[in-house]
Amino acid sequence: MAPKNNAKGGDKKGKGKDASEGDKGKGGGKGLKPATSINVRHILCEKFSKKEEALEKLRNGAKFDDVAREYSEDKARQGGSLGWKVRGSLNADFEKAAYELEPSTTANPKYVEVKTGFGYHIIMVEGRK
């Protein structure tokens, strides 16, 4: 199957990678320097259908923290912010996915989906150190 490319005339308007390049949901962590801690946000949904609704909002350009406030069942008031987390302090599957993400902003998030015993997570990273 050919890769998705929904670009409209190749207009990038000075932005980095966008959803039309198929990168937004993948994180693209290749070449990242090792980090001992990350500043992470997530949207936690118990139900698959609710997670899909949240993803659709993100794909349509909504800010990550706004979607977290509306859909997340954890840390919703903080826009999904978990703060700075060191290696070993998070669920193993969640942590593996989060540490592979490139940092991004809530206005133009790079995110990844993970299912854990807690439910469905949509994760983004704001910083690494």
Curated annotation (Swiss-Prot):
<dbReference type="GO" id="GO:0006364">
    <property type="term" value="P:rRNA processing"/>
</dbReference>
<comment type="similarity">
    <text>Belongs to the PpiC/parvulin rotamase family. PIN4 subfamily.</text>
</comment>
<keyword id="KW-0413">Isomerase</keyword>
<dbReference type="GO" id="GO:0003755">
    <property type="term" value="F:peptidyl-prolyl cis-trans isomerase activity"/>
</dbReference>
<feature type="compositionally biased region" description="Basic and acidic residues">
    <location>
        <begin position="9"/>
        <end position="26"/>
    </location>
</feature>
<dbReference type="InterPro" id="IPR046357">
    <property type="entry name" value="PPIase_dom_sf"/>
</dbReference>
<protein>
    <recommendedName>
        <fullName>Peptidyl-prolyl cis-trans isomerase pin4</fullName>
        <ecNumber>5.2.1.8</ecNumber>
    </recommendedName>
</protein>
<feature type="domain" description="PpiC">
    <location>
        <begin position="35"/>
        <end position="127"/>
    </location>
</feature>
<dbReference type="GO" id="GO:0005634">
    <property type="term" value="C:nucleus"/>
</dbReference>
<comment type="function">
    <text>PPIases accelerate the folding of proteins. It catalyzes the cis-trans isomerization of proline imidic peptide bonds in oligopeptides.</text>
</comment>
<dbReference type="InterPro" id="IPR043323">
    <property type="entry name" value="PIN4"/>
</dbReference>
<dbReference type="Pfam" id="PF13616">
    <property type="entry name" value="Rotamase_3"/>
</dbReference>
<keyword id="KW-0697">Rotamase</keyword>
<feature type="region of interest" description="Disordered">
    <location>
        <begin position="1"/>
        <end position="34"/>
    </location>
</feature>
<dbReference type="InterPro" id="IPR000297">
    <property type="entry name" value="PPIase_PpiC"/>
</dbReference>
<dbReference type="GO" id="GO:0003677">
    <property type="term" value="F:DNA binding"/>
</dbReference>
